[in-house]
Swiss-Prot record:
GO terms for molecular function: 4 iron, 4 sulfur cluster binding; metal ion binding; rRNA (adenine(2503)-C2-)-methyltransferase activity; rRNA binding; tRNA (adenine(37)-C2)-methyltransferase activity; tRNA binding. This is Dual-specificity RNA methyltransferase RlmN. Reaction proceeds by a ping-pong mechanism involving intermediate methylation of a conserved cysteine residue. The gene is rlmN. Binds 1 [4Fe-4S] cluster. The cluster is coordinated with 3 cysteines and an exchangeable S-adenosyl-L-methionine. It comes from Neisseria gonorrhoeae (strain ATCC 700825 / FA 1090).
Length: 364
């Protein structure tokens, strides 16, 4: 079987070329061809010796996930569905803004966690994505979006906030991050690459040590009672442990704050008392809040908080001198908004079946 070179960061490529008896600089050349020029085969790599190209064609490949579907929202948001084999597809979303272009990347086929308000979680879980399948999303988006009139890349920021829990696919995510940051890859700044987690504490510590990029934490609750219900991972890593991990992460983080993401669920976590509890919870963690109006999906069982409740919640946090943004809903007409990504998941957990049985029971 041929080796897919998209699975390697520069260190891995260098080892691979050493095993082939080639000099280390070949790794940098090939990496630039793949990620900066968008090369899909070795014959395009004209500065490589013909003998090396022949050897690479025999032993290696550049396998990028196939594009199944592309959609564009009325607000300019774009979504791609990529085929990752065996009936599975993952979604990637590009969000244009006046000062930046952000790509939201998936890390798993489905999600192993079961956050109750998330469409991806309802789809169940099939497998982790390979490093090639993760970086392949940026490859596709980069090819589709091109460059600005000033010859700058349209994609300036990457957030690991698509399908899946990135920390549960740690090694492959770190390899993909390494390619994103490498000057021979995409040359992104650590400050402009964000990994989001629901709170896998040991992996947060590992990421801090090996690849400290910006960190976002899917918080969504101000106390353990509520969070246990809507983010079941909290039963393993409760809020006290999570806050301590956030403090440790900041020691090496490229930004001097953690972003806490908080989906606003009507009657669940959006009362004034929850805002005051949040203030107490995060008092020792430099942070900013991103309030996310819930994006409905069929049979979710939740409603979006009213604009008034969101405003009151925001004002309480701001009065306590926190930076607070209320996320604009982008791409909801193509199901590309936060919490709506579902892709195509051949579920191995029977979670889809479980939710169907619950719904049948509710309708009966």
């Amino acid at each position: 079987m041929k080796t897919n070179l998209l699975n390697y960061d520069l260190q891995g490529l260098t080892r691979h070329f050493a095993d082939m008896g080639e000099k280390p600089f070949r790794a940098k050349q090939v990496m630039r061809w793949m990620h900066q020029s968008g090369a899909q085969n070795f014959d395009e790599m004209t500065d490589l010796a013909k003998s090396l190209r022949h050897k690479l064609n025999e032993q290696a490949s550049i396998e990028i996930p196939k594009l199944m579907m592309s959609q564009e929202s009325s607000d300019g948001t774009r979504k791609w569905l990529l085929d990752v084999g065996t009936g599975n597809g993952v979604e990637t979303v590009f969000i244009p803004e006046s000062d930046r272009g952000t790509l939201c990347i998936s890390s798993q086929v489905g999600c192993a966690l079961e956050c109750t308000f998330c469409s991806t979680g309802r789809q169940g879980f099939n497998r982790n994505l390979t490093a090639a399948e993760i970086i392949g999303q940026l490859w596709w988006a980069n090819k589709a979006m091109g460059v600005t009139p000033k010859n700058e890349r349209v994609i300036s920021n990457v957030v690991m906030m698509g399908m899946g829990e990135p920390m549960a696919n740690f090694d492959n995510v770190v390899t993909a991050l390494s390619i994103m940051l490498d000057d021979h890859g995409y040359g992104l700044s650590r400050r402009r690459v964000t990994v989001s987690t629901s709170g896998m504490v040991p992996q947060m510590d590992r990421l801090r040590d090996v690849m400290p990029v910006a960190l976002a934490v899917s918080l969504h609750a101000s106390n353990d009672e509520v969070r246990n219900q809507i983010v079941p991972l909290n039963k393993k890593y409760p809020l006290k442990e999570l806050m301590a991990a956030c403090q440790r992460y900041l020691v090496k983080a490229p930004r001097d704050f953690i972003t806490f993401e908080y989906v606003m669920l009507d009657g669940v976590n959006d009362k004034a008392q929850h805002a005051y509890e949040l203030i107490e919870l995060v008092k020792d963690v430099p942070c900013k809040f991103n309030l996310i109006p819930f994006n409905p999906f069929p049979n979710s069982g939740y409603e979006r908080s009213s604009n008034e409740n969101i405003r009151i919640f925001r004002d309480i946090l701001q009065q306590a001198e926190f930076v607070v943004t209320v996320r604009k809903t982008r791409g909801d007409d193509i199901d590309a908004a936060c919490g709506q990504l579902a892709g195509q998941v051949q579920d191995k957990t029977r979670r889809q079946q479980k939710w169907q049985q619950i719904l049948i029971g509710q309708q009966g």
